[in-house]
Amino acid sequence: PENAYRNGTMYSSYTAASFARKYDLAKAYDINLAGAVTWGFEFEDQQWYAGFRDMATNGVDKPVLNVFRMFGMMEFNRLKVEGDFDYDYKKISDASVRDNPDVNALASRGENAVTVMVFNYHDRNAIEVKPTPVTLNLEAIPSNKVLVSQYRVDEQFSNSYTAYKAMGSPKNPTLEQIDQLEQAGQLELFTSPQYMQVKDGKLTLNLDLPRQGVALFKVEFMP
């Protein structure tokens, strides 16, 4: 379809990157941002993955919806994120993302956990490029032991569109295929959660994030 990018990871990574910058804009202009919504619709009795601006197709969740599930897991006392970044909100608003990819993060803390969303977005939907190595250094963790879970939205994880294309893009999926698509459309763990030791309140997490990928780390404080 003409707007096939809305079916896959370009739309989901763009959503992560753009929503993160809304908070930067609000801070820059001293605005109390109480919430944000996405411009999405519901289209009934349409072809599968027709490229509409929606969160699901014929009841099957698309990757973009899993990014909103990630946002829903973030308890919002926002944490400061520092790093060697190629873009800020002003550069993106002036020139968009044309050169290096926009690799950045949004972090928050709740009573018993820290969550960090990492995204790797580019205006050119070239998903075949090499993943970007990312190192997260967390500080001031109030526990000596944590449980770390990583969720992922990319070409292989939490992506019903990839599953649909692997089926041959059927115009009328069977009930069995629909069941497979529904399962593929759920938010997936990248690996099994693991316990990690914290030293002097610090923890380092490493990942290789594919182009147009989004990762969410949930770091739960253990007693």
Would you name each region that the model predicts?
Residues 1-113, 117-129:
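Aromatic/acidic polysaccharide-binding cleft in carbohydrate-active enzymes
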Residues 117-223:
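C-terminal beta-sandwich/jelly-roll accessory domains of carbohydrate-active enzymes
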